[in-house]
Amino acid sequence: AKKAGYDGVEIMGSEGYLINQFLSSHVNKRTDRWGGDIENRMRFPVEIVKAIRAKVGEKFIICFRLSMLDLVHDGNTMQEVIVVAKALEKAGVTLLNTGIGWHEARIPTIVTSVPRAAFADVIAEVKRHVTIPVIAANRVNMPETAEQLLAENQADLVQMARPFLADPDWVAKASLGQTDLINTCIGCNQAC
């Protein structure tokens, strides 16, 4: 990515993917140095970050998408998430992105019935314990919601994807104050 001219990369460490599986006692039943307590379970992502940082130098952006709320049985506690967030920061992560829930979680996280910015308190709690910027995601689909998260210091940045699929002119309309013209993402999670 660096050789191709990118400013940074994001490491997917949430939603139940491989790195998240090492982090969570939900599936990590290992009894070696890669399993057990959180210090061992976080070894895999921390080593990944350290290796990337060593290759790309200090100025290259490394964003880590961390599962801040697993929503599965035996998922990480908030205390464990904070320990991991601090360790990732120390290992060289530039930004922390928000992952909420595993794909197989029975609790909805992005559908219409979930209130906008429903997980802001979880994000803000992690933000209180690190010095690197924390990105809010999940059910942030209108400019007012994003601005509120930033104004209330619950996040440093806001990430969106589905809202831009619903309206490719979202940013232009928001910047012109035409939020009433935005084709709002309704969180149907279909074809996106």
Language-model regions, residue ranges each:
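Flavin-dependent oxidoreductase catalytic cores
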Residues: 2-192
